[in-house]
């Protein structure tokens, strides 16, 4: 209730002033295939709790999620029509964004998809919320707990096979701890088990589709051709096969920002590790990106970590996680 209450403003002589919070109307939620329930819930529930109706368009990769939401809301007694879902093509989705009955659009997905939504909504003067991709960086300072940094950054890079908007996609390590970090990271990655997502011993599943794996393979090979060193052998991951969504993890060193793997969203199980000489070099490289979703710094000096974090061009900043 407090979150939906009017916002009181300072009184003026003869006036009482407040900002009244009211429902927008119809909220069109466009949800992605990765974390298909969580990302959708983050948009659906605030909209409904604030008194809006919701139309959900889920990814073609995860169509049953929409239907499960509908079943759950029916079982909960939500009034008919407050939540609806549509299975749509990209063209149909654009048409819904343009429809005058839609009062707000909440989109989670790729940068190209977000650009489509923004373009389709242009001139309608409605609110549009966009949560897009990232090339999220991490920096391991000289004073960091290396074992902890390896554990957290590797998990951040390979969790969900790297298919996370907030996944760690590039890592900068101070030269004084670079070798120790790299060796521990290699050991960590080699323990991953590539397998079917329904197998109990699998710790690294397939990508969402073959074309996604092909994209990461091409990006990785291009970096190797430019001088990057690959530290993981695909031979250790028998399910890795071209023409399938199964892709072995990869750690790349001797990388730089001339390589797409360090500047373009990968959304897969590959991460580049670059040596830096100073905090300033790390900050400059972390900010050398068109993205700005999350970033992390690993250090034992929390005060210094906060100082560095304030120099980062990012929406969310973490220390030691």
Where are these regions (language model features)?
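Long amphipathic alpha-helix in the N-terminal Rossmann-like dinucleotide-binding domain
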Residues: 1-3
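Short glycine-enriched loop/turn motifs at secondary-structure junctions
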Residues: 80, 99, 132-134, 165-166, ...
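Well-formed, non-transmembrane alpha-helical positions, independent of function
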Residues: 46, 95-96, 152, 222, ...
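Rossmann-like NAD(P) dinucleotide-binding subdomain of oxidoreductase/dehydrogenase enzymes
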Residues: 7-148, 276
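A short hydrophobic/small-residue beta-strand
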Residues: 53-55, 230, 316
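Residue-level recognition of oxygen-bearing side chains
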Residues: 61, 91, 101, 145, ...
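ALDH superfamily catalytic-core signature
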Residues: 104, 112-256, 280, 285, ...
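Conserved C-terminal structural/oligomerization subdomain of aldehyde/semialdehyde dehydrogenase
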Residues: 102, 193, 239, 246-321
């Amino acid at each position: 209730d407090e979150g939906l209450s009017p916002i009181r403003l300072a009184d003026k002589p003869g006036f009482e002033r407040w900002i009244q919070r009211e429902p927008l109307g119809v909220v069109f939620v466009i949800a992605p295939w990765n974390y298909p329930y969580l990302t959708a819930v983050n948009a659906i529930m605030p909209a409904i709790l604030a008194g809006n109706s919701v139309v959900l368009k889920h990814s073609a990769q995860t169509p049953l999620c929409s239907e499960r939401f509908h079943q759950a809301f029916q079982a909960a007694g939500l009034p008919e029509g407050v939540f609806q879902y549509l299975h749509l093509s990209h063209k149909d989705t654009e048409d819904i964004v343009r429809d005058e009955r839609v009062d707000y659009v909440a989109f989670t997905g790729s940068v190209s998809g977000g650009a489509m939504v923004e373009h389709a909504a242009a001139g309608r003067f409605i609110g549009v919320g966009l949560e897009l991709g990232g090339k999220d960086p991490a920096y391991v300072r000289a004073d960091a707990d290396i074992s902890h940094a390896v554990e957290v950054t590797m998990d951040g890079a390979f969790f969900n096979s790297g298919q996370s908007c907030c996944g760690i996609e590039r890592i900068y390590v101070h030269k004084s701890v670079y070798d120790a970090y790299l060796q521990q990271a290699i050991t960590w990655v080699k323990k991953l088990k590539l397998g079917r997502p329904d197998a109990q011993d699998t710790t690294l599943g397939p990508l969402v589709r073959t074309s996604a794996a092909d994209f990461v393979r091409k990006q990785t090979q291009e970096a190797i051709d430019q001088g990057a060193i690959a530290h993981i052998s695909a031979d250790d991951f028998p399910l890795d096969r071209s023409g399938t969504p199964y892709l072995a993890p990869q750690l790349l060193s001797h990388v730089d920002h001339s390589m797409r793997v360090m500047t373009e969203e990968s959304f897969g199980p590959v991460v580049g590790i670059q040596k830096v000489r100073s905090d300033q070099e790390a900050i400059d490289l972390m900010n050398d990106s068109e993205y700005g979703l999350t970033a992390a710094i690993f250090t034992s000096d929390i005060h210094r970590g906060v100082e560095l974090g304030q120099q980062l061009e990012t929406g969310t900043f973490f220390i030691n996680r």
